[in-house]
Each structure stands twice: as C-alpha cells, then as structure tokens.
Amino acid sequence: MSRGGIQGFESERLSQILAARRLSQAQLAALVGVSPATVSKWRSGNQAPERETLERLAGVVNVTPEWFTRAPSAKVSLPLFRSNASAHVAARAMLEARMEWAQDVALALSEFVDYPTLNLPTRQFKEPDEITPDEIELAASECRDLWRIGRTAVPDLALAIEGAGVVLIREETGISQIEGLSAW
C-alpha cells in the first residue's frame, strides 16, 4: 500500500465482495460513507481503509473485518457456466466470486476432513465446444462403471458424485439464466 490504512488489506477480496453482492463501487461507497474514488483506491491496492472504516465496510457487506486481510486462495480454473447467452455479466461475476468462496471453504475443511480420492474418467478436451453428446454418453457410462452404480436410475446423484471425490455446492441463486457452473 502506498498510503495509510490497515496492514494486509487484500484488494482482491474487495473485488470479490463487489461481485458477490452485485454492488458497484459507487453503491458500496454510499453504504460505507466514503467517496467512490476511495473505494477505487482500495480496489486498486493504492490505499487501504482505516480500521474504523474497515469495520463499517465489513458490516455493510456482512463479513468479518479479518476476512478482508485473508489472502484469497489460488483459482483452480475459470468457471464453466451452464447458461443461456442472455446471462448478465454481473450475474456471472457474482457466481464466480461465490465459487471462489466455496473453494476457500472446501480448502479450509480439507485440513480437518479427508475427502474421497477423485474417481472420474479422464478426457483431453481443451474447450467445452469439443464435447459431443456421444462423448457425454460415454463418460456417463464410464462413471457408472467406476462408481459401481449400475444402469438403472441413480437415486441420489449428488451422493454418488461426492463419493467419487467431487466437492458439490448447491445454492439457490435467483439467477434463472444460469443453471449451474463448475471449476476444476
């Protein structure tokens, strides 16, 4: 930081919270009682909020002040959205930020819980466009064999994929244009 404020403020966390709460810098500034330029400086890393301001900021967005000083975990991949073309950029940004939080939680939990070993068929696709319906059918068949779940209806698919080592998060988002997303 070049000027003032608390030590260790992670500007990436501010970007995450803006996306996750679907707030503009100006809206957040009004809620916290600072200028939009100040929020811009926090976001760029040129300035950090003072302790009292950080507490107001945290209260407004419903996180602890300490959360803004935690380094974000490394992104595993860009999310792949299952959505129609009309899905708004802000909605995608919100879900991407929330996925990053889910990854943070899963990583923290892994310190206390042993996740099952990942047990999925391997594919060499580089782009989602390369995946054909036949490839999906083949992968589904391989999953059924790997997981020993037979060829009949799967009573609890979420339980089956969690047992195969996949971390599954289910959340009602209120964004009807996006049916789901994944990252690896």
Annotate the PLM regions.
Residues 1-184:
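Short juxta-domain linker segments that transition from a proline/glycine-rich
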